[in-house]
Amino acid sequence: MVVLVDTVSSTPVRPRHPEKAARPDALSPKKPDWIRVRAPTTRGYGETRSIVKENGLVTVCEEAGCPNIGECWDKKHATFMIMGDTCTRACAFCNVKTGMPGALDPNEPAYVAEATRKLGLEHLVITSVDRDDLADGGAAHFAATIRAVREACPTTTIEILTPDFLRKDGALEVVVAAKPDVFNHNLETVPSRYLSVRPGARYFHSIRLLQRVKELDPTLFTKSGIMVGLGEERHEVLQVMDDLRSAEVDFLTIGQYLQPTRKHHAVMRYVTPDEFGGYAKTAYAKGFLMVSASPMTRSSHHAGDDFAKLRAARAALAR
């Protein structure tokens, strides 16, 4: 279980997810020495949190209980989660709450743009909850947010981490037309684990979505990630790599799954740093331009630095 101690806020911890309350506790093995969580105590963390709250924004850093929040917020790096804090799905790994979301805030794109300006972000990551209740899955809102940031901060590069827009015809085209710099959509786990880990999604739909992004705009960088430690086998991880490369995905992230609460999916195994290194080496050999694989790797961790490396890798390949 990941425990983050917020020494800045006195806000009580949110109760356990009501939709998971009837589940038996899932016990995970003790965390090994290589799993370390930095407590968020710095001035930079406090300043970032103030800007987020002043603009009435939600971050995936907080909602998902990200273990890297102390490091990232100290550097004034935050990943904004648009369209509310309530998801229409109930994935077994995710700490974001589930329920019926409220109406979209039409001012949210402007608030995100203003927070981006105040934080001085050179690279912005925008993600969202799943909004299966909306006709377009929130695609137009994503596009509006990208455009608002472009107008307010024209030099800021933009990375988006989207839901799968399952059964939302035309939604992907709307988002791609807004021209983010990086389009990220995470597979989260191997196909055999979808029923227990990500039951509301479809593995090959996600692969096709990433492939379609490249068809719509070959200049966009595409990115995807998975968690390990959920019961997958090594050969399954390698097959995911092959599937992503068949969709011409540029950037792969692999990180250790950490259990948010005992009502979430248990950690089946802690993958060693050496194994992560092996995955990275294999992924590069399969043709990915950029790979980040480590116990604490998360989609948005070091996203700005990684984007610079990704762009340099493409430029080197074109020479």
From Swiss-Prot:
This is Lipoyl synthase. Residues 1-28 are annotated as: Disordered. GO terms for cellular component: cytoplasm. Belongs to the radical SAM superfamily. Lipoyl synthase family. NCBIfam families: lipA, PRK05481.1, PRK12928.1. [4Fe-4S] cluster 1 binds at C61, C66, C72, S300. It comes from Rhodopseudomonas palustris (strain HaA2). It is found in: Cytoplasm.
